[in-house]
């Protein structure tokens, strides 16, 4: 009976340890995914910033050309 008790405690302890390790790995994976999402969001913001900046420059150049043509 004592042998069975010790075996049961050992199995429960090992199960608890493995569960703890799995939960820790799961949290690490979730943190990595959140970090990747944040990096992708930053890249998208930078891309939109560049696109809008270039579009603004192009529009300003066109307006300047139209104004210059009207003055001639």
UniProtKB/Swiss-Prot annotation:
Predominant localisation class: secreted
GO cellular component: extracellular region
Membership in a protein family: Belongs to the frog skin active peptide (FSAP) family. Dermaseptin subfamily.
Signal as UniProt keyword: yes
Species per Swiss-Prot/TrEMBL record: Phyllomedusa bicolor
Cleaved propeptide residues: 23-43, 71-72
Name the record gives this protein: Dermaseptin-B6
GO BP annotations listed: defense response to bacterium
InterPro entries in the cross-refs: Frog_antimicrobial_propeptide (IPR004275), FSAP (IPR016322)
Residues modified as Glutamine amide: 69
Function: Possesses a potent antimicrobial activity against Gram-positive and Gram-negative bacteria. Probably acts by disturbing membrane functions with its amphipathic structure.
Subcellular location: Secreted
The entry's keywords: Amidation, Amphibian defense peptide, Antibiotic, Antimicrobial, Cleavage on pair of basic residues, Secreted, Signal
Signal sequence bounds: 1-22
Tissues in which the protein is found: Expressed by the skin glands.
């Amino acid at each position: 009976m004592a042998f069975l008790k010790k075996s049961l405690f050992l199995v429960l302890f090992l199960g608890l340890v493995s569960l703890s390790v799995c939960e820790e790995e799961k949290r690490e994976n979730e943190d990595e995914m959140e970090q990747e999402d944040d990096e992708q969001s930053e890249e998208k913001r930078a891309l939109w910033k560049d696109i809008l900046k270039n579009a603004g420059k192009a529009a300003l150049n066109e307006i300047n050309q139209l104004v210059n043509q009207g003055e001639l």
